[in-house]
Amino acid sequence: MSLTYMNMFMAFTISLLGLLMYRSHMMSSLLCLEGMMLSLFVMMTMVILNTHLTLASMIPIILLVFAACEAALGLSLLVMVSTTYGMDYVQNLNLLQC
C-alpha cells in the first residue's frame, strides 16, 4: 500500500472517529461528514486512475453530486434547528425527548 493511499485511509478514519466522538454539535458532525466524503472522492479517483478503469470514471463525479446534496441538506437542517431551538446540538433532533 503506497503512502498516498495510507494518508487517504487515515483521513477517512480520523473523520469517522471525529464523527463518532464529537457528536454534540451539528456543525462538527457536518464537517466530519464532508471530510469523509472528500477522502472517499480522492481515494476513488486514485484507484480509478491507477487501474485505468475508463468505464468507472464517472463514479467520483456522482459521489461529488451526492456530497453536494448532503451538504445542502445538512446546512438547511442546521439553519432550521438553530432558528427553532437557538443552538445546534444534535440532541435537539431527537423527537422522543419532546
From Swiss-Prot:
One GO MF term on file is: NADH dehydrogenase (ubiquinone) activity
Matching InterPro entries: NADH_UbQ_OxRdtase_chain4L/K (IPR001133), NUOK/Mnh_C1-like (IPR039428)
> Which residue positions does the secretion signal occupy?
none
Q: Which Pfam families match?
A: Oxidored_q2 (PF00420)
A Gene Ontology CC term for this entry? mitochondrial inner membrane
Tell me where in or outside the cell this protein is found: Mitochondrion inner membrane
Where is the major localization of this protein?
Answer: mitochondrion
Its quaternary organisation is: Core subunit of respiratory chain NADH dehydrogenase (Complex I) which is composed of 45 different subunits.
Q: What is this protein called?
A: NADH-ubiquinone oxidoreductase chain 4L
Organism equals Vampyressa thyone (Northern little yellow-eared bat)
